[in-house]
Design a protein with these regions (language model features):
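Active-site phosphate/pyrophosphate-binding segments
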Residues: 1-115, 189-209
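Glycine-rich, anion-gripping cofactor-binding loops and their flanking helix/strand elements
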Residues: 101-137, 168-182, 190
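Generic C-terminus detector
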Residues: 142, 168-209
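Glycine-rich phosphate-binding loops that contact phosphosugars or nucleotide phosphates
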Residues: 1-39, 120-162, 184
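A cross-family phosphate/adenosyl-ligand binding-site feature
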Residues: 151, 157-178
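Active-site proximal loops enriched in glycine and acidic residues that flank catalytic Cys/His/Asp
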Residues: 71-73, 82, 98, 120-123, ...
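Alpha-helix N-cap/helix-start and coil->helix boundary motif
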Residues: 75-76, 152, 181
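Composition- and surface-driven signal marking solvent-exposed, interaction-prone regions
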Residues: 81-82, 98, 128-133, 158, ...
Length: 209
């Protein structure tokens, strides 16, 4: 949602300001991050231009009783946001799990036909996350994957469907990754006939203690 994306932008700016003030980021890296930050709106438009694909994926899976999200590091956090949005507006049971924790009980929830949304946008963690994808696939799960353009072809060899996001500086990936997750929740809710603008039992802001 707009609040989540705006908070990310504010945190980026605060982080850059502090790094510059403390001298913990060299000038070249600082300039690179700022340049990529300015390109985020354009790259978000690219994602929105491909939203028909996400709508199609939603049409395939909107009747699933449970949908699980997995990811490592910040991908896990974005998975939690995607799972939360899905629960809020589509009323589907959904949980997000750290991919590295799958073997500690979570994987017992996977059965044939279960949908797992796997986020693997960080190149350094891609192979480890994909090893978890192989584990859930071997147990019959359907997998919808999200990764950067540079690794989309590799991911497509294992998962059922891929949502690619434009490449950017690793620190800025959450701003791109979160939008397909929110769109997926939106289109799933539409398919289910839910009132997206007025989710049940939710208020726009917290007004009571």
């Amino acid at each position: 949602t707009k609040a989540f994306s705006t908070q990310l932008a504010v945190v980026y700016l605060i982080g850059l300001y502090c790094a510059e003030a403390l001298g913990t980021l060299d000038e070249a890296e600082y300039d690179r991050i700022v340049s990529e930050l300015l390109l985020i709106p354009t790259k978000l438009e690219q994602i929105l231009d491909n939203r028909a694909d996400i709508q199609y994926f939603a049409s395939l899976y909107f009747n699933h009783p449970s949908i699980f999200f997995i990811g490592r590091n910040i991908d896990y956090a974005i998975g939690m946001e995607g799972s939360l949005k899905l629960k809020e507006i589509s009323y589907i049971h959904s949980e997000a799990y750290a991919a590295g924790e799958l073997k500690h009980g979570t994987i017992s929830l996977i059965e044939p036909g279960t949908l797992v949304v796997a986020l693997a946008s960080y190149v350094k963690l891609f192979d480890k996350t994909m090893s978890n994808v192989v584990e859930v696939k071997s147990r019959g799960a359907d997998v919808l994957g999200l990764t950067v353009d540079a690794r989309a072809a590799d991911m497509a060899k294992t998962v059922d469907h891929v949502i690619p996001v434009p490449d950017t500086h690793p620190l800025l990936l959450p701003s791109l990754d979160v939008v397909p997750m929110q769109l997926f929740a939106y289109y799933v809710a539409l398919q289910r006939g839910c009132d997206i603008d007025k989710p049940r039992n939710l208020a726009k802001s917290v007004t009571v203690e």
